[in-house]
């Protein structure tokens, strides 16, 4: 007898907190039973009940080539056959470090780690060690991993210290983090004018992907660069999501912004656990064993993950790769916007490279507050209706979606046809029409 998603979820909750190993997978935001998957191929994956889905999550971004790309699978098999871990230097980790520095002009040196959280917390420690300062600026709605210093929410005013957004984070730790509004140039200028000499770094997603998808304005990023330079603070671009997902030179290439440090993850591991942080040589040389800022990891530079990452990075350098990816993503977002308008549904969408955001409101949001004004009940209805028809979007109104190189006109057309039927069957139409 075939096991069901519900049966697995009930068993999982006995042994795994909430039944999942990362909270969003529990479907708490949208309700219902999480889907348990057992295999994937290209733009599709299949659950334990044998149902297939067009996948617009892509393991939350890493699978830019799609599921089980044959060249990536082959690279992993070869690497694993030679040994799954050495805890020592390898030629392959040097190769990927050289490649990352060649592809991203802002990287003069790079350190490999195993997760985006690890990269983010290491970059923060490095910035503090380099500058001798403690204060960090982050922006409301941006997510940089579950490091204590970054699980912080805004206080009651622009210059108030942050408060923990998770139990277990000491108030003293959160107090070193200032939380400002995304795309708020005036707020950043005011904060630097009063506290600039105390700020070690500003960390920001150039395209935010954890409050759905919000693009930074050019003025916002240029202001951050100017103020960090003026006050001796480091600008850290969190490109865990956008890195090699929105273009070959990442979001910093699209905006023409050169950060002091960059955080990378997801795509560079090809679907296996790997991330990195890197940047200016004088800053990176503060890391042990050269300097006094300590960072280490047993599985850092894991040879199997490096093999998957190298093959993925080679594939995305093929001429025209990002043109095709962007075209498919825009076809999806523009098509969804058109069918929603056809049925008078308050809806919009936008895309950057292979990332996209869907919003049940009339215009794309520019801040966390505007995201919160979107019609989340309408999103939840849409999510479950699409899921039932075999289209898998992120199970949260606050997460970006992803298109892979394996998505073709066939998958996009199927998705739009399903959305057309669902929008036509009676979504909530005008509640948020003025937003």
Curated annotation (Swiss-Prot):
Pathway: Porphyrin-containing compound metabolism; protoporphyrin-IX biosynthesis; 5-aminolevulinate from L-glutamyl-tRNA(Glu): step 2/2. Its main location: cytoplasm. Transmembrane segments: none annotated. GO terms for cellular component: cytoplasm. The keyword Mitochondrion does not apply. It catalyses: (S)-4-amino-5-oxopentanoate = 5-aminolevulinate. Its EC number is 5.4.3.8. Its cofactor is pyridoxal 5'-phosphate. The keyword Cytoplasm applies. The modification N6-(pyridoxal phosphate)lysine is found at residue 266. It is found in: Cytoplasm. Belongs to the class-III pyridoxal-phosphate-dependent aminotransferase family. HemL subfamily. This is Glutamate-1-semialdehyde 2,1-aminomutase. It comes from Nitrosomonas europaea (strain ATCC 19718 / CIP 103999 / KCTC 2705 / NBRC 14298).
């Amino acid at each position: 007898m075939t096991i069901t998603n519900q049966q697995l979820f009930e068993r999982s909750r006995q042994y795994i907190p909430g039944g999942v190993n990362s909270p969003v997978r529990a479907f708490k935001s949208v309700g219902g039973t999480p889907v348990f998957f057992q295999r994937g191929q290209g733009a599709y994956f299949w659950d334990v009940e044998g149902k297939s889905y067009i996948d617009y999550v892509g393991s939350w971004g890493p699978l830019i080539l799609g599921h089980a790309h044959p060249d990536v699978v082959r690279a992993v098999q070869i690497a694993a056959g030679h040994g799954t871990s050495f805890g020592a230097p390898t030629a392959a980790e040097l190769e990927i470090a050289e490649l990352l520095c060649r592809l991203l002009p802002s990287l003069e040196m790079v350190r490999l780690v195993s997760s985006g959280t690890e990269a983010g917390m290491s970059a923060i420690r490095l910035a503090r060690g380099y500058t001798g300062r403690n204060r960090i600026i982050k922006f409301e709605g941006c997510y940089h991993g579950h490091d204590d210093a970054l699980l912080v929410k805004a206080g009651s005013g622009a210059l108030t210290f942050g408060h923990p957004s998770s139990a277990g984070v000491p108030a003293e730790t959160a107090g070193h983090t200032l939380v400002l509004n995304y795309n708020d140039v005036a707020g950043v200028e005011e904060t630097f004018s009063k506290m600039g000499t105390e700020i070690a770094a500003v960390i920001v997603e150039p395209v935010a992907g954890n409050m759905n998808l919000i693009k930074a304005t050019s003025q916002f990023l240029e202001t951050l660069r100017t103020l960090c330079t003026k006050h001796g603070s480091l600008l850290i671009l969190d490109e865990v999501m956008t890195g090699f997902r929105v273009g070959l030179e990442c979001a910093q290439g699209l905006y023409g912004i050169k950060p002091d440090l960059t955080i990378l993850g997801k795509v560079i591991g090809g679907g296996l656990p790997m991330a990195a942080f890197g940047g200016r040589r004088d800053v990176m040389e503060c890391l042990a064993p050269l300097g006094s800022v300590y960072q280490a990891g047993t599985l850092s530079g894991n040879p199997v993950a490096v093999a998957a990452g190298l093959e993925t990075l080679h594939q995305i350098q093929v001429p025209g790769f990002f043109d095709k990816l962007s075209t498919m993503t825009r076809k999806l977002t523009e098509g969804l916007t058109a069918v929603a308008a056809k049925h008078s549904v308050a809806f919009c969408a936008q895309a950057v490279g292979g990332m996209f955001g869907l919003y049940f409101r009339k215009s794309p949001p520019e801040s966390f507050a505007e995201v919160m004004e979107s019609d989340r009940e309408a999103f939840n209805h849409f999510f479950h209706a699409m899921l039932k028809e075999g289209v898998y979007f992120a199970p949260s109104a606050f997460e970006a979606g992803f298109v892979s190189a394996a998505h073709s006109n066939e998958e996009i057309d199927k998705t739009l046809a399903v959305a057309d039927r669902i929008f036509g069957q009676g979504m909530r139409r005008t509640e948020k029409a003025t937003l």
